[in-house]
């Protein structure tokens, strides 16, 4: 099982390049950053994590800028978005950013995506909350065309372009792995159709179904759709450094666990990184 760490990389926390180097030196397999372009001051959408939204959400760096800085300071650690809000992004521009990052990092990018929760933030980008999953699907399918074709074209309801030339292509073939966040009733449909793995938060099940049972259901659905179930990566996101919890994740069939780090300066975050690192071996 692989181990990674996630932080809201902000203008007041440890720099992303310094964090990546610390993680790589301690044997972590991957580093992850989330995304929010902004938080509307008039937000009414409830944050799933509780009543008070942490300021990290509106101080975080652009994920691709942060990960590019991390790539330049490291050699081997993988670099992921957890998650990238493709519902708020231009697919042509983002396909270019990801291909560039994958090229410059030597093929180390992992593309974590999701539907998000902040309706007001999405609407500022022109995306209707109720249509976000359809927008996400077309964005991802269009980006795959750009990454894998010499003259890609795409004609959908939300994304539409004629044949184009768009380089570089990603180092990873056919493209960087795409992991779907979330745990809704149709999440597995999305994973099986256009993703390479599943990234649930917290390692918990839902609806009375355990994580281990969920993984069995996902792999069964993948096999029924003609996909190799063992090709799907299961990444459990946002965990604490608890040996018993990590053991349960391993038994459930999780391939990677991601620890959550607070958005703090180096001195404050180093002890927690060291605590997490003890579980890697």
Where are these regions (language model features)?
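Active-site-adjacent structural elements that line small-molecule/cofactor binding pockets in enzymes
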Residues: 1-281
